[in-house]
Amino acid sequence: MPRSWQEMNALTLAYLGDVVYELWVRTHLLNNGYEKVNELHRLATQYVRAGTQAKLLHHILPHLDEQELSVVHRGRNAKGGHPKSTDVVTYRYATGFEALVGYWQLTGRTERMLWAFEQVDQFVGEEDEGKGKGETAKEEESITDALSPAEQSEIDC
């Protein structure tokens, strides 16, 4: 018998959410006419980086229901890996987003998930604005730079 999502560790939800989001990103790019592998990789990296995921989460937060917010909190507060190219706060928001995606996948809320994913284009590449082709930001902007204190407390536990 399959386990309920409620019994799963938040990092397990994030693990699933990571692959679901990555698959959507790759499919999205292919459906939009990108075919060169180097370009696909460069663009996919912009979509899946922690800063982009954290900004997308911040954008959809006001539209999440109580259960979804609870999943985000669990993911954000889970103790897990260490960020590679971003700060801890941004990394945790991204983990919260991935946990939410895992929750949506396990509960069959595909329409909700796709609604969120379809809003990501506006956040892709923000960290790289002003840089030449092929250059990427060494460190991402912290999501806390974009949040007001009230917004930070809304997602804090």
From Swiss-Prot:
One of its GO terms (cellular component) is cytoplasm. It is found in: Cytoplasm. This is Mini-ribonuclease 3. Keywords: Cytoplasm, Endonuclease, Hydrolase, Magnesium, Nuclease, Ribosome biogenesis, RNA-binding, rRNA processing, rRNA-binding. Homodimer. Involved in correct processing of both the 5' and 3' ends of 23S rRNA precursor. Processes 30S rRNA precursor transcript even in absence of ribonuclease 3 (Rnc); Rnc processes 30S rRNA into smaller rRNA precursors. Residues 126-157 are annotated as: Disordered. Gene3D superfamilies: Ribonuclease III domain. GO terms for molecular function: ribonuclease III activity; rRNA binding.
